[in-house]
UniProtKB/Swiss-Prot annotation:
It comes from Arabidopsis thaliana. It is found in: Golgi apparatus; Cytoplasmic vesicle, Clathrin-coated vesicle membrane. GO terms for cellular component: AP-1 adaptor complex; nucleus. GO terms for biological process: intracellular protein transport; vesicle-mediated transport. This is AP-1 complex subunit gamma-1. Its main location: Golgi. PROSITE patterns: GAE. SUPFAM superfamilies: ARM repeat, Clathrin adaptor appendage domain. HEAT repeats lie at residues 97-135, 136-173, 248-284, 308-345, 346-382, 384-417, 418-454, 506-545, 560-599. Pfam families: Adaptin_N, Alpha_adaptinC2.
């Protein structure tokens, strides 16, 4: 007999496929068999239909397409015999899913079989419906399934309950139809029916709030009694698993009680005793007992429970941490991370065990335990926990050092009791895992060092000793090079010795040796080499006796393949050779970097509630990155070419703070084209924003000069961010310089502002702030409107760092004068005024419209309010 003939049995086809040695042979066998099956389908021979479908199911499991046999499933389902129906329903569940249109044709057959007199046929239909039920089928067949929940046979009731779960997931609107039927299943004695009934109730509670309240009031006590009976029941062989009576039912009941007790104190009180009983009586030496205990802990943590029961639950998790099974330890760590929000002290008792998990060979457990330890750290235990983590950092795997060092740095920055301790711990991390430390961490360390003037000598000596031993740690070398460049004289002269230090002797040549090694080492990157060059330039002034050696090291870098290094070497050599008279002032110590300002810039320029556009940072010469600033255009949802204006709250660049423009490129580009004219406002001229006043022209020229300082010296940028801007004094003199700017005219004086009158408006009002606009026109210039904004504080708290920003469409031009103050007193006891000038290029055709943003600090927290003004008077 040919093994591939139409009469091949399923067993023979499987044997032939398994005998194939290559995938090509297998495809040939399957292709031949599928062709024979298609031929038989076309002949519509009912004799071999069940055999063909069985073959198709096997072929489908191998991954080959079998869509041509879907109609055969429907034909077998419609046949009267039970064997044919069984194969047909099996094929239906395997070859089809709920997205197939063919399912529309099987709904009628399912309805007939659900009403069949043979309970086994009913069971087949329920199984199929529970597996592939679609929303349309659920609506059509829900009444039959609801009726079958009350069927006399427990197997049918069990399958009907599972099928009901599928139906309410697909069509939540049908949930209320199954509430009473589901409640009746909770009284069943048959464990199979009971567990499906509990699952159905659980689904109903998560989908329908009314069902949740119904089960909470009507069924909570019954569920508690059922759980108590199962917990206290005698040995039952048919349900016993490792000494636990039906752990699956235990778990389902606990999950349902968790939903019922969550957010309801009365229901939680009812289940307190049984949860304590389950937690204390369940054995934890087998996996089944651990599963029940875990669900019990989950329930205790979720309900409105007392602290005593939560302490019991946390102690159970502590025992889990000592288990040899990695899965149990992992879930215990996960649960403890949730439990720490409820009872920190109870979790702290297991701190030693959790620390041991950080050293676990399993990577997942190590990472989760490290996250938990980070949550456990506070001001009282930071010293002990940090010591433990740093000790482990020395022997940890390379793969784990990055995560571990990042967490240690986070802990040290957040909880350090003093700067000396902070510096010591950071140096230990840099020594052990310096190459894994991120840039912002060592930047922050430098900021802290610069602020700790009494520790400059101690720090530079500690770094010098560390870099001699751990020269392969790139980040450590960078910090050491920076500190030696800044405080090399303190290193050589042993200035600022602390009692905990041992005296060391370091010569000027020794200090330069460290810098030379950093710049000549083959694996040093460009950042380290650039920082080393800067340090050499600074040491040439601090160590005049070896300035020639320093000069020789700098000259060697003229031949560097890196353009940046070449340029620096040439410029620094010129400074050492030709500009000795200004060298000492050029290489003076950097001004103290403001920690608060640095932290703000590190976290972002705007509050977290304001979305900022991703933008590359601006690299500054000392390696510190300037964070990008979100453009006001994006914040106010206007077109990118709309014109915007706002007064700068500090001495920083107008463009950088408001528009997010690269201040280095803009200033350099302008300087390359022409020299700035004295007394002209270059920024406003470039942007064509409006007509500046002479006083503002002079300050803008100063602002342009400060741009170069910001680029060359980040510390100036940090300082200017926190310094208030000087108020501008309007004057009417020096009008001749405006003739150079294509007919721009000086700002109108108050005496000349007496155009037509317009009614004032309330531009913006919230529960805490009110903004009023008053308007006036300049005679002979109807396109320009003078607006005076008055800001009133309606809240009982004073606003500080107040700033008003605005943006207008591109047919408008906007100019803002400085505000009268940056502090807005509480309860309307004082007001801030600010003058705006709006030029409407389409005056008479389009009305004024403005988007505005108001920022201020309330009790030290940044607050941001936004609004749109569209109720300007007509004619503006």
């Amino acid at each position: 007999m040919n093994p591939f003939s139409s009469g091949t049995r399923l067993r023979d086809m499987i044997r032939a496929i398994r005998a194939c040695k290559t995938a090509a042979e297998e495809r040939a066998v399957v292709r031949k068999e599928c062709a024979d099956i298609r031929a038989l389908i076309n002949e519509d021979d009912p004799h071999d239909r069940h055999r063909n479908l069985a073959k198709l199911m096997f072929i489908h499991m191998l991954g080959y397409p079998t869509h041509f046999g879907q109609m055969e499933c429907l034909k077998l389902i419609a046949s009267p015999g039970f064997p044919e129906k069984r194969i047909g329903y099996l094929g239906l569940m395997l070859l089809l899913d709920e997205r197939q249109e063919v399912l529309m044709l099987v709904t009628n057959s399912l309805k007939q079989d659900l009403n069949h007199s043979n309970q086994y046929v009913v069971g087949l239909a329920l199984c199929a419906l529970g597996n592939i039920c679609s929303a349309e089928m659920a609506r059509d067949l829900a009444p039959e399934v609801e009726r079958l929940i009350q069927f006399r046979d427990p197997n049918i009731r069990k399958k009907a309950a599972l099928c009901s779960t599928r139906i309410i997931r697909k069509v939540p609107d049908l949930a209320e139809n199954f509430v009473n039927a589901a409640a009746s299943l909770l009284k069943e004695k048959h464990h199979g029916v009971l567990i499906t009934g509990v699952q159905l109730c659980y689904e109903l509670c998560t989908i329908n709030d009314e069902a949740l309240e119904y089960f909470r009031t009507k069924c909570t006590e019954g569920l508690i009694k059922t759980l108590r009976d199962i917990t206290n029941s005698a040995y039952q062989p048919e349900y016993d698993v490792a000494g636990i009576t039906d752990p699956f039912l235990h778990i389902r009941l606990l999950r349902l009680l968790r939903v019922l007790g969550q957010g309801d104190a009365d229901a939680s009180d009812l289940m307190t005793d049984i949860l304590a009983q389950v937690a204390t009586k369940t054995e934890s030496n087998k996996n089944a007992g651990n599963a029940v205990l875990y669900e019990c802990v989950e329930t205790i943590m979720a309900i409105e429970d007392t602290n005593s029961l939560r302490v019991l639950a946390i102690n159970i998790l502590g025992r889990f941490l000592s288990n040899r099974d990695n899965n149990i330890r992992y879930v215990a760590l996960n649960m403890l991370m949730k439990a720490i929000t409820f009872d920190d002290q109870a979790v702290q008792r297991h701190r030693v065990t959790i620390l041991e998990c950080v050293k676990d060979p399993d990577a997942s457990i190590r990472k989760r335990a490290l996250e938990l330890v980070t949550l456990l750290v506070n001001e009282n235990n930071v010293t002990q926990l940090t010591k433990e983590l740093i000790d482990y950092l020395e022997i940890s795997d390379e793969d784990f050092k990055e995560d571990l060092s990042a967490k240690i740095c986070f802990i040290v920055e957040k909880f350090s009791p003093e700067k000396l301790w902070y510096i010591d711990q950071m140096l230990k991390v840099l020594c052990e895992a310096g190459k894994f430390v991120k840039d912002d961490v060592w930047h922050a360390l430098i900021v802290v060092i610069s602020n700790a003037s009494e520790l400059h000598g101690y720090t530079v000596r500690a770094l010098y000793k560390s870099v001699l031993t751990y020269s392969e740690q790139e980040t450590l070398v960078r910090v050491a090079v920076w500190c030696i460049g800044e405080y090399g004289d303190l290193l050589v002269n042993n200035v600022g010795m602390l009692g905990i230090e041992d005296p060391i002797t370091v010569t000027e040549s020794d200090a330069v040796d460290v810098i030379e090694d950093a710049i000549t080492r083959h694996n040093s990157d460009s950042t380290t080499k650039a920082m080393a060059l800067v340090a050499l330039l600074k040491l040439s002034s601090r160590f005049p006796s070896i300035s020639e050696r320093i000069k020789d090291i700098i000259v060697k870098q003229k031949g560097s393949l890196l353009l940046e290094m070449q340029q620096r070497a040439i410029e620094y050599n010129s400074i050492v050779d030709r500009h000795k008279n200004i060298r000492s002032s050029l290489v003076d110590r950097m001004p103290v970097l403001d920690e608060a300002t640095f932290n703000v810039r590190r976290a972002g320029s705007f509050p977290a509630s304001v979305s900022t556009m991703a933008k590359p940072s601006v690299s500054l010469q000392n390696g510190v990155e300037k964070l990008p600033v979100a453009p006001l255009v994006d914040l106010l949802d206007l077109d990118s070419d709309d014109i915007m204006a706002a007064p700068s709250p500090s001495g920083t660049d107008f463009l950088q703070d408001l528009l997010g423009v690269d201040l280095g490129s803009s200033s350099a580009q302008y300087g390359a084209t022409q020299a700035p004219k004295a007394g002209t406002d270059l920024l406003l001229d470039i942007l064509s924003i409006g007509t500046p006043s002479p006083a503002q022209n002079s300050t803008s020229s100063i602002g342009l000069l400060s741009i170069a300082d910001v680029n060359n010296n980040p510390s100036i940028a940090l300082d200017t961010l926190s310094s208030p801007a000087p108020p501008h004094v309007a004057t009417t003199s020096s009008t001749g310089m405006f003739d150079l700017l294509d007919g721009l005219s000086p700002s109108p004086s108050k005496e000349a502002t007496n155009g037509p009158a317009y009614a004032p408006i309330v531009a913006y009002e919230s529960s805490s702030l009110k903004i009023e606009f008053t308007f006036s026109k300049t005679p002979g210039n109807l396109q320009t409107t003078n607006v005076q904004a008055t800001f009133t504080n309606l809240s009982p708290n004073t606003f500080t760092d107040f700033i008003f920003q605005a943006a207008v469409p591109k047919f408008l031009q906007l100019h803002l004068d400085p505000a009268s103050s940056n502090t807005l007193l509480a309860s309307g006891s004082g007001a801030i005024t600010q003058n705006l000038r709006v030029t409407n290029s389409q005056q008479g055709k389009k009305s004024l419209v403005m988007r505005m943003r108001i920022g201020y600090k309330l009790n030290g927290k940044d607050v941001l309010e936004e609004g749109q003004v569209s109720n300007f008077p007509r004619g503006l």
